[in-house]
């Protein structure tokens, strides 16, 4: 049961505050304890109940069931490791592949020092950081997509 206090619009103090831009909901219902103790748990438990119900009624399969008697031609890692796997697979020297994996975070650490003159947060006013981000995103998607192809088609993604 919510207790609502109606504003007295004839009060000169309230009219002065409203004239200065104070919101109309000044006399509204407080968030503590009403929302935090009653509304939020209902929403959280309802969401959990909905997710559990969907998982029980319609379970999603995670890939094909394992068959111990059929080995795939090429064993692939999880999807989020495809770019790393592709770098190690394409480069001829494995030490070079590991060095490339270490060079990626080191290169990202250098970006703030390269662009230290620029103090803006807007990406359109930070061309070096934006270019590094876009280049890294495109290369990561390209490597991740190429990891699913055979080794001879992996760099061209089977297009050429």
UniProtKB/Swiss-Prot annotation:
- GO BP annotations, alphabetical order: photosynthetic electron transport chain
What is any Pfam family matched here?
A: Cytochrom_B_C
Q: How does it sit in the membrane?
A: Multi-pass membrane protein
Residues annotated as transmembrane: 36-56, 95-115, 131-151
Q: Which PROSITE patterns match?
A: CYTB_CTER
Q: Name one GO molecular function term.
A: electron transporter, transferring electrons within the cyclic electron transport pathway of photosynthesis activity
Q: Which UniProt keywords apply?
A: Electron transport, Membrane, Photosynthesis, Thylakoid, Transmembrane, Transmembrane helix, Transport
Which subcellular locations apply to this protein? Cellular thylakoid membrane
Keyword set includes Nuclease? no
Q: Main subcellular localization, coarse class? A: membrane
User: How is this protein annotated for GO cellular component?
Assistant: plasma membrane-derived thylakoid membrane
What's the family? Belongs to the cytochrome b family. PetD subfamily.
Quaternary structure per UniProt? The 4 large subunits of the cytochrome b6-f complex are cytochrome b6, subunit IV (17 kDa polypeptide, PetD), cytochrome f and the Rieske protein, while the 4 small subunits are PetG, PetL, PetM and PetN. The complex functions as a dimer.
Q: What does this protein do?
A: Component of the cytochrome b6-f complex, which mediates electron transfer between photosystem II (PSII) and photosystem I (PSI), cyclic electron flow around PSI, and state transitions.
What is the protein name for this chain?
Cytochrome b6-f complex subunit 4
Organism of this sequence? Crocosphaera subtropica (strain ATCC 51142 / BH68)
